[in-house]
């Protein structure tokens, strides 16, 4: 972000390299489908490698895996509680058409951050490179919309902060449903894929981000369905930093302004969440 734009945002808010190193084995087993990510050449001994920093289990850690939990924070639908919970080896995010966020033109059921202990969590700061891998199950009831439906975000913590990167379900004027990754700060589309073939099945996600200001950042986004690579796109020279730090969010965050009639009661499942730092 430019110095002038950062100053404006700072006042308003109060205040990847596409690496080729392969994922390290962490020994974790899950009942839900495991990650099946693209093979990559082994790095030379002198190069940086991905270091496992976070490997929660839904079964044993539950919602304690995350820094914060935003379950109906406006208390709009007490009868629907809990909207976010662990079930077996998965984390489930349930959303109903009657749910409302604190801004009543939208809905939100999300978790944030990577908790590593009762009072500790990982902080993604400027100059660092991080990688998140997981599997997600998108049911056919979780449809793309003509306005925003985000199922992953990268944000600066704090009230009112704008998203930096979003993974979204978007419906175009012709009704086509896609899943996309976008650099929200500068509204740059990194990549997209058809959503219909990914409905009602597990999809593997591999997201990498170098946290950098102005043009110092980068991202890489990979989706796999079984053994098929659905999308593998990178963007360098990207602005991936606002201030303080970057924190990931998962769940369902969507606008009520959809004009396609696609909003209905639905859910999202996540499993096999892993966090790595390039070091």
Task: Set out the residue ranges of the language-model regions.
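Low-complexity, Ser/Thr/Pro/Gly-rich disordered linker/stalk regions
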Residues: 2, 9-22, 35-279
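Twin-arginine (Tat) signal peptide motif
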Residues: 1-9, 27-30
């Amino acid at each position: 972000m430019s110095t002038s734009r950062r100053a404006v945002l700072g006042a308003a808010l109060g205040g990847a390299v596409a690496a080729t190193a392969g994922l390290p084995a962490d020994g974790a087993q899950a009942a839900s489908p495991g990650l099946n990510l693209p093979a990559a050449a082994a790095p030379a001994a002198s190069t940086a490698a991905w270091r496992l920093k976070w490997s929660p289990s839904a079964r044993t850690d539950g919602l304690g895996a995350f820094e914060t939990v935003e379950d109906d924070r406006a208390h709009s639908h007490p009868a629907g509680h809990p909207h976010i919970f662990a079930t077996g080896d998965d984390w489930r995010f349930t959303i109903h058409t009657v749910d409302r966020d604190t801004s009543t033109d939208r809905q939100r059921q999300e978790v944030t951050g990577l908790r590593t202990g009762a009072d500790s969590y990982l902080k993604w700061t400027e100059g660092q490179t991080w990688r998140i891998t997981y599997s997600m199950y998108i049911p056919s009831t979780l449809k793309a919309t003509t306005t925003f439906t985000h199922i992953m975000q990268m944000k600066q913590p704090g009230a009112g902060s704008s998203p930096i990167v979003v993974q979204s379900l978007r419906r175009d004027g012709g009704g086509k449903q896609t899943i996309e990754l976008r650099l929200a700060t500068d509204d740059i589309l990194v990549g997209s894929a058809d959503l219909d073939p990914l409905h009602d099945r597990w999809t593997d996600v591999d997201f990498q981000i170098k946290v950098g200001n102005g043009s110092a950042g980068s991202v890489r986004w990979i989706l796999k369905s079984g053994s098929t690579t659905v999308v593998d796109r990178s963007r360098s020279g990207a602005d991936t930093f606002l201030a303080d730090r970057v924190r990931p969010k998962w769940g369902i965050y969507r606008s009520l302004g959809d004009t396609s009639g696609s909003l209905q009661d639905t859910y999202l499942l996540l499993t096999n969440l892993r966090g790595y730092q390039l070091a």
